[in-house]
Amino acid sequence: MKNQCYEHETARTIQDVLSCDGDLKIALVADSHLDNSAPETVENISAVDQAVHFDCCVHLGDFLAGEIGGRYAGLLLRQQIDLFRPAVSNGRFFPVQGNHDACSGPYSERLWPETIGFLDAEPGVCRPARKPYYYVDIAKEKVRLVFLCSYFYEQRGGEPVMIWSCRM
């Protein structure tokens, strides 16, 4: 059931999306930062999806709210991703690691790659050896969506990411 506060916004969004002549429809979310309104956000995306049938949902990162210690960060990040994954009816969900999606200590470099492991089974996704960056091909539209990372544990961007992107 749609939150009544957002009924007007949802109706306007449906109308706007349906009036566009584009073929690719993406539900785009960013900076949820463990917000208490995240369930309502997912509910609203789902309500719009029922009418427009999004091709996927993309979350541009910052699921968390800054550095959180170790395993607690992993638990919170998995909860947030699990909350957003079913936002669109076809289940296609592509998260990006934001600069606040980190944690402290040795666990940090494993956190994001482990959490997005579900992408390895997603059709059309190419993710090099457990890296936080990847791309997905949307075959029906002949589109490649490239997702880079604004927080890379081993190094800040640099040569490996550039080499990978040139080989795509």
Q: What do these predicted regions represent?
A:
Residues 1-74:
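N-terminal active-site segment of His-dependent metallophosphoesterases
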Residues 5-13, 70-168:
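Extended active-site neighborhood of metal-dependent phosphoesterases/phosphodiesterases
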